[in-house]
């Protein structure tokens, strides 16, 4: 990607600023999402604001970073965004409920089952910004995090935050 982007005329600084690439210890420009399936983060207005990448094959075993997200930038702040919000906002308002899951593939799986009022905060750290965004559409949030210890802890913490916000 870095090589193709440079051939198209993109400058190194732009590729670094947008988070598509990073520099390794030798100063080489490296593709941030190499070997990963890419999921675009589409903001509430319908514009791509960032990307997430996930290793899906056998290389997942032992990989330190199974998931890689865009770094914070002028247009992307992970704690301000919700994966799938643009596609889900009408269904959330119509159903007066939103399901909050952990990851991109959870959102996609639920959509495949016909459940469209679902978003992900891409991990377990629910933020006040994300709660306020959802509150524009509904006061009814159901947390559907994974059943591991991190998911259970996040669901308890998230429930406390939601109750503090009157939801």
Language model features: what each stretch is:
Residues 1-141, 154-155:
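Phosphate-handling DNA/RNA-contact segment within nucleic-acid enzymes
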Residues 133, 160-167:
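Arginine/glycine-rich "motif VI" loop of SF2 helicases in the C-terminal RecA-like domain
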Residues 147-163:
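Phosphate/diphosphate-binding loops
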């Amino acid at each position: 990607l870095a090589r193709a982007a440079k051939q198209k005329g993109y400058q190194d600084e732009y590729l670094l600023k947008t988070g598509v690439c990073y520099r390794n210890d030798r100063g080489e420009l490296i593709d941030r999402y190499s070997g990963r399936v890419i999921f675009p983060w589409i903001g509430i207005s319908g514009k791509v604001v960032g990307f997430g990448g996930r290793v899906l094959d056998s290389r997942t075993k032992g990989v330190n970073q199974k998931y890689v997200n865009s770094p914070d930038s002028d247009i992307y702040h992970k704690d301000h965004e919700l994966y799938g919000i643009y596609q889900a906002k009408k269904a959330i308002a119509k159903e007066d409920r939103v399901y909050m899951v952990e990851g991109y593939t959870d959102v996609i799986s639920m959509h495949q089952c016909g459940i469209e009022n679902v978003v992900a905060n891409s991990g377990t750290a629910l933020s006040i910004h994300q709660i306020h965004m959802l509150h524009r559409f509904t006061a009814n949030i159901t947390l559907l995090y994974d059943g591991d210890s991190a998911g259970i802890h996040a669901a308890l913490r998230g429930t406390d935050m939601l109750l503090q916000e009157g939801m």
